[in-house]
């Protein structure tokens, strides 16, 4: 009798264990993807993960090569309140922050004003504004320690997100995309943020939703130790009481092909999964799809929901057509997401102080 009970117990354990690992089980799928509608992109992702994590599959990928890359703005963090987080932050720093606004150099002030004119009046930004912004941001945050800057970013992230009710900037993440991140983590994937935004802004925002600080790649700015001054770092040795501070040097904007080069330098492996939302992510996607060793997949999120977000539907339609032609999987915010920012968040009109 004891042997029979032991056999039944072991059998039950084996059955329960095998069920808990079967990613296609409806209960498991519902646990991971409660914020999703059934859709082609989600089915494709689950099929992909099921396939490449199955040791018996010809497409099996060793766990050390389970590399996934994510853009940030517009991919898992909102970029429509009313523009990129880092643009909103610089506008505030230069034009509204009483601790800095009277110190801002004229070129930095001009850049911040161009952001304000863009978001409030619809005035187009100048060509190559991403580089102009980078140079201005380098000056605006120069002298801040990394800890001070991290705290500054997080304090701004606690402000109400313009254009929404019931949400701060920091809470403005796409909840369905966070479910994908958790799903991949639980299935042995190592995931990186590869963003065009300031690396240290991305660290502050992305670590709050589960990314490790050393898995963040972004636009690069100069650093130095606090007493280094103008000394060449090759000719200088920092003291024990020094801290690392931001310099006024803008080094690199991590967009388009720079994303590929940064991935190659910092990760050292070609991703097998890639997630993005814009032309700035296409090179990263193509780099992923060029990985001939393994089965790969790339996903583009389309901001096509003007009921729950401040979407430009004409632009969304153009992007969707382009991404389908490139053979990327399409994630539709309107059709595929049960919620975007959460059930208690409501889109409202933008409000600007007079």
Language model: regions and residue ranges:
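Non-catalytic pre-domain segments flanking phosphatase-related domains
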Residues: 4, 18-72, 80, 94, ...
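C-terminal cap/substrate-recognition subdomain and adjoining C-terminal extension
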Residues: 23-34, 50, 65, 148-354
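Bacterial N-terminal signal peptides
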Residues: 8-15
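A metal-dependent, Asp-based hydrolase signature
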Residues: 81-84, 88-170, 175
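Electropositive phosphate-/nucleotide-binding environments in soluble metabolic enzymes
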Residues: 39, 143, 257
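Bacterial N-terminal signal peptides that target proteins for export
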Residues: 1-8
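Single-residue recognition of alpha-helix boundary sites
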Residues: 14, 82-86, 206, 292
